[in-house]
Amino acid sequence: MAGTVSLELDPIFLKGLGYLHSKSKDSAEKLKALLDESLARGSDSIYRNSIKEAEVSKVSLPKMTKQDSKSSSSSSASSSITTTSSSKSSTSEKSKKESEKRTLEKIRVDPGEGVEPPKKPRLEKQDSHSSPIAFQTKDIPIPDFTDIDETNADDFAMEMGLACVVCRQMTVTSGNQLVECQECHNLYHQECHKPQVTDKDVNDPRLVWYCARCTRQMKRMAQKTQKPPQKPAPALATTVPLLKDPLVKKAELKPKPETTGSFQAFKRTEVKATAASGNSSSSSSSSSSLPPGLTGWAAFTKATSNVGPSSTKLSTSQSGNSKTSPAASGSKPVGLSALANVKPALATKPSGGSSAGSGNGNNGSGTVPLKAPPPLTLGKQVLSRSASGDSLGKMTVTGSLSPGAAPSSSLGGNGGSGGNGAGNGGNSAGSSSSSGNNNNNGAKASADGKAPTSQESQLNAMKRLQMVKKKAAQKKLKK
């Protein structure tokens, strides 16, 4: 049986197996030679190639195990032989019979003819293997090599930073040297740079030179660094109300002392309290100082109200009738303040027609505007300041002297000695009135005489406070 099996097997296949299992170094070359001879058989080679392609997938695993056992040099060459051997071993008996016929044909062929044809296919095989390699080189590297050949020197110079950025050349002449920018480290020819570089910049021993692009960027950065200190200006503007707030709070906290320089309007709650106290104690505190609850403009109205009653007293004492008190109040500015003065005058009519009674009535009417409601005193203050000038101008307003009409009232005079007629009337009233009334009048006159000095001191204090506040606000803004 062994003899029959040996006859059925192809001798080329046996040779291939022998070369495959041999450990000699030439086994790979001999396997290549056998492969070339088998491929050079014409139609038989085509048939064998078809069988190889059909069964390559089936025998892929045994091929890998055999190739791993061999050396790396023989593995690439023996893979094709293993495909042929595996295909032949797996074919049917018909393929074996055909292989026997092929061996007979090979024997009939002359040895010279058998040697010559394999040489031709070897060349063809080499061409076939070299052709795809040639295509690969043409597809990928050949265009790259052409580009590199053209721009290799320029690119190398540019990468190394040895060439001009504009013209991409390294040529240097006496008037056209390469200058390096200290910021971006690019090289420029003196002529290539748009603002041409002068020889002074080239020969500068400090070697500090900046290109046009870098100079622009540096200018922009300098402007940006200068702008941030300018931007906080609105921040200072926003801090101004913050600075004002504590000043306002201080002004609101200061109404408690009697003399303050702030012109803030007082609160309604304080107004009601002062009005109630004024109505309750209308006949008392004739020559008292400024009330503690009044601040700002109310303090000025208090001072003017102290001046007003003294003049009305002089006029009423001259007429000698209690009915003249409404007329005296009529000499004052017409408005709500006049009505406020009329009510206490009417209340004093039942006291009698004597000069002493009129003096008492005037005392009552004089004390009411001291504690009058602040809105009324505000209006009165504005009118009296515009009409008489109060303590600032110290001007006197004189009216027509008639026994039935309103006599002259000296506003802002020296404490009761106004015009000549009013002064005479005051003297006659002092002689005709009782000693108690004279004492009251004297006290009021003395109080009225002190009023302008207190107003002047208030004005001076207010001016000083305003100046101090302005200076403090300016210092805070400067900080």
Curated annotation (Swiss-Prot):
Family matches, as SMART domains: PHD (SM00249)
Alphabetical UniProt keywords: Metal-binding, Nucleus, Zinc, Zinc-finger
Residues annotated as transmembrane: none
Biased composition (Polar residues): 305-328
Subcellular location: Nucleus
Molecular function as annotated in GO: zinc ion binding
Gene Ontology CC, one term: integrator complex
CDD domains referenced in this protein's UniProt entry, alphabetically: PHD_Int12
Composition skew (Basic residues), residue ranges: 466-479
Pfam families: PHD
Biased composition (Low complexity): 70-90, 223-239, 280-289, 399-411, 429-451
Record-annotated disulphide pairs: none
Compositional bias (Basic and acidic residues): 91-128
GO biological process: RNA polymerase II transcription initiation surveillance; snRNA 3'-end processing
Gly residues bias (residue ranges): 354-364, 412-428
Location of the region described as Disordered in the Swiss-Prot/TrEMBL record: 57-140, 221-241, 274-293, 305-479
PHD-type Zn finger ranges: 161-217
InterPro entries linked: Int12_PHD (IPR039054), Integrator_subunit_12 (IPR051776), Zinc_finger_PHD-type_CS (IPR019786), Znf_FYVE_PHD (IPR011011), Znf_PHD (IPR001965), Znf_PHD-finger (IPR019787), Znf_RING/FYVE/PHD (IPR013083)
Biological role: Component of the integrator complex, a multiprotein complex that terminates RNA polymerase II (Pol II) transcription in the promoter-proximal region of genes.
Quaternary structure note: Component of the Integrator complex, composed of core subunits INTS1, INTS2, INTS3, INTS4, INTS5, INTS6, INTS7, INTS8, INTS9/RC74, INTS10, INTS11/CPSF3L, INTS12, INTS13, INTS14 and INTS15. The core complex associates with protein phosphatase 2A subunits PPP2CA and PPP2R1A, to form the Integrator-PP2A (INTAC) complex.
Homology family: Belongs to the Integrator subunit 12 family.
Name of the protein in its database record: Integrator complex subunit 12
